[in-house]
């Protein structure tokens, strides 16, 4: 039997395996709400330009309402042999209302139809992600404020070696800044994708007297796309969203990695809540940060989606090719992965138990205050490079002797350089070092509090 959608050209039906391979219903049925919305608007436009009678429009709209009720109730008869969500809805509409259902596809192709559905879907998905990003940013702000008084200090790292002490609040706000940019990228992507492909038809437009501005306006797009080839052939809007999701997941992965490290016995800075950890089937003592590990791993999954779709579109000639069917699975999966990761971190972070004394001791160790001594000599007039060497030699001696910076006496400091005076000794205390980093964007409490107050206003917590 010939295919009901395009069977006129063919003398026999498709191979069974080929038909299953060709079908996309398993994943594009997620677009059913957008397809119904588009169908309603397209039908009203066809009526407005005289291509549907009032009676035909009424029948179509009632049929679409019935279909929506069936899908919501779980009684809609999805049929894989109809390939995709578009043909399933159209076939059911025709069953319900007869010939008017077959008129709905006038002046439209599945090429512009699916491109329109996908843009509509992404608009809604981005709005959901922006709300989740806002919620997580609020969590980060609250956690920063909670750990600012009393001061929670941890070692800052470069090359994963202890470098200089920083406030835990400063650490939280670092991720706040990353997530703020992530939200901006999604907002930018939404702005660019908000143009309507509907009416481009297969690739060349249509001879019917349609009103593309009508459908664009009714669907909430800012305008119709200006080139019919571009409208059906381009997936850069999907790639841009995937790029934003990829960067966002990279940031969540970095946070997860740090928390995994900090929760080990070797660091011992933090304990992960029981609700977000698992045990071992053989080792009774284990508490594994599985959720954080999965967020870290799933960042690779989203990166794979971005790379995969890039590979799909890189060599496609204009206009539509079936290759573009491969845009939805990675995109929908990446959206769900990022959404769930945001929700999980927003729930996990407030339950973290930070070990203030352990962090403080670690921040004091590792010669993290050596830079304070080099800065001191530079402030006294010694060229910084020379000051760097002086303190470097001092640290080497302490390492050899197994001593800490805070053990130094004034006499020992002066033995390394005569510019050291009594006022250098407070620099060997963690509190002094933290308060000295008061440059704009620095880790001093007053600098962090200033940024915290700004961040609270940005997320509506003022």
UniProtKB/Swiss-Prot annotation:
Gene Ontology CC terms, in alphabetical order: cytosol
Pathway assigned in UniProt: Amino-acid biosynthesis; L-arginine biosynthesis; L-arginine from L-ornithine and carbamoyl phosphate: step 3/3
InterPro entries, per the entry: Arg_succ_lyase_C (IPR029419), Argininosuccinate_lyase (IPR009049), Fumarase/histidase_N (IPR024083), Fumarate_lyase_CS (IPR020557), Fumarate_lyase_fam (IPR000362), Fumarate_lyase_N (IPR022761), L-Aspartase-like (IPR008948)
EC number from the UniProt entry: 4.3.2.1
Entry keyword Cytoplasm: yes
GO biological process: arginine biosynthetic process via ornithine; L-arginine biosynthetic process
Top-level EC class: lyase
Catalytic activity: 2-(N(omega)-L-arginino)succinate = fumarate + L-arginine
Main location: cytoplasm
Keyword annotations: Amino-acid biosynthesis, Arginine biosynthesis, Cytoplasm, Lyase
GO molecular function per UniProt: argininosuccinate lyase activity
Subcellular location: Cytoplasm
Protein family: Belongs to the lyase 1 family. Argininosuccinate lyase subfamily.
UniProt cross-references to HAMAP family, sorted A to Z: Arg_succ_lyase
Protein name (record): Argininosuccinate lyase
Species annotation: Thermus thermophilus (strain ATCC 27634 / DSM 579 / HB8)
């Amino acid at each position: 039997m010939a295919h009901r959608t395009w069977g006129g050209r063919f003398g026999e039906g498709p191979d069974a395996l080929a038909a299953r391979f060709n079908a996309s219903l398993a994943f594009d049925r997620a677009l059913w709400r957008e397809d119904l919305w588009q169908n309603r608007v397209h039908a009203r436009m066809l009526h407005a330009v005289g291509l549907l009678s009032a009676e035909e429009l009424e029948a179509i709209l009632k049929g679409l309402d019935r279909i929506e009720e069936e899908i919501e109730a779980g009684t809609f008869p999805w049929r894989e042999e109809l390939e995709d969500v578009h043909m399933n809805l159209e076939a059911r509409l025709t069953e319900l209302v007869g010939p008017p259902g077959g008129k709905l596809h006038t002046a439209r192709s599945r090429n512009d139809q699916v491109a329109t559905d996908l843009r509509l879907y992404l608009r809604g998905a981005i709005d959901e992600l922006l709300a989740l990003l806002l919620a997580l940013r609020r969590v980060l702000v609250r956690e920063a404020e909670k750990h600012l008084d009393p001061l929670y200090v941890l070692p800052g790292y470069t090359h994963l070696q202890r470098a200089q002490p920083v406030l835990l609040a400063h650490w939280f706000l670092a991720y706040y800044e990353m997530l703020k940019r992530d939200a901006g990228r999604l907002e930018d992507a939404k702005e660019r994708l908000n143009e309507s492909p509907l009416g481009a038809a297969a690739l060349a437009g249509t001879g019917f007297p349609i009103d593309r501005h009508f459908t664009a306006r009714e669907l909430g797009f800012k305008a119709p796309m200006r080139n019919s080839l571009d409208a059906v052939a381009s997936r850069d809007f999907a790639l841009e969203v995937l790029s934003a999701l990829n960067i966002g997941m990279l940031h969540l992965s970095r946070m997860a990695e740090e928390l995994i490290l900090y929760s080990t016995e070797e660091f011992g800075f933090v304990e992960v809540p029981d609700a977000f950890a698992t045990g071992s089937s053989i080792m009774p003592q284990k508490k594994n940060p599985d959720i954080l590990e999965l967020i870290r791993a799933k960042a690779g999954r989203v990166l794979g989606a971005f790379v995969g779709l890039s590979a799909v579109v890189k060599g496609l000639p204009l206009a539509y090719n079936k290759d573009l069917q491969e845009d939805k699975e990675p995109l929908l999966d990446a959206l769900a992965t990022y959404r769930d990761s945001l929700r999980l971190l927003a729930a996990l972070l407030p339950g973290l138990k930070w070990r203030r004394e352990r962090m403080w001791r670690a921040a004091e160790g590792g010669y993290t205050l050596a830079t304070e001594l080099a800065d001191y000599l530079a402030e006294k007039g010694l060229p910084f490079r020379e000051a760097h060497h002086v303190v470097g030699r001092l640290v080497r001696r302490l390492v050899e002797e197994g001593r800490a910076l805070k053990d130094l006496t004034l006499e020992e400091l002066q033995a390394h350089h005569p510019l050291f005076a009594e006022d250098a000794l407070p620099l060997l205390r963690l509190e002094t070092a933290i308060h000295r980093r008061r440059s704009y964007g620095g880790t001093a409490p007053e600098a962090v509090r200033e940024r915290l107050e700004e961040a609270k206003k940005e997320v509506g917590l003022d």
